Amino acid sequence: MKTGIVTTLIALCLPVSVFATTLRLSTDVDLLVLDGKKVSSSLLRGADSIELDNGPHQLVFRVEKTIHLSNSEERLYISPPLVVSFNTQLINQVNFRLPRLENEREANHFDAAPHLELLDGDATPIPVKLDILAITSTAKTIDYEVEVERYNKSAKRASLPQFATMMADDSTLLSGVSELDAIPPQSQVLTEQRLKYWFKLADPQTRNTFLQWAEKQPSS
């Protein structure tokens, strides 16, 4: 099983389309959802960037940073989930620029009025729409895909309805089932399709790191 997955992932290294924009990841940003799809944290762990095509995009993320307290101690600050939408048309690189977040006062100010910039490769600000993702679920584990779908259907400041339509069900991710030798349970198919999706977005170094990790995993 492991060999089959690795072989499939190696095949995905072959170019299938031309990506035009590199999203540089920040160590202070925990990316949760990209364009309506949950981010594969295991695949992106340690990645410096992911590749995007030209056009509108939407990120859902939290800012996570160690801040200093008045008693000389430290704590991990975690922001509420934020939504930012932007367009990468004619842009080859996107970089995060966060405000100063070093102490409790600055963290509280950011909670009350989040603000940040996305910069292109020339350090020019990219027009963005930023909002807080209000979580409606009371479940212990939050399904961010569901929350983002609800948000995108509600005509909020940073909503992009086209991503709500894409995530109404997983039919787009399941459309490639026919390429498998046998039809496994839907949950397994969906997991594989999601893995393929994020593998294709990852930069070459991240792909290689993931493949090396996959080779070391025990066969099921």
UniProtKB/Swiss-Prot annotation:
The keyword Nuclease does not apply. Coiled coil: none annotated. The keyword Iron-sulfur does not apply. Transmembrane segments: none annotated. Keywords: Signal. Residues 1-20 form the signal peptide. InterPro entries: UPF0319. Pfam families: DUF2057. NCBIfam families: CrliSynInhib, PRK03641.1. HAMAP family: UPF0319 (MF_00789). Belongs to the UPF0319 family. This is UPF0319 protein YccT. The gene is yccT.
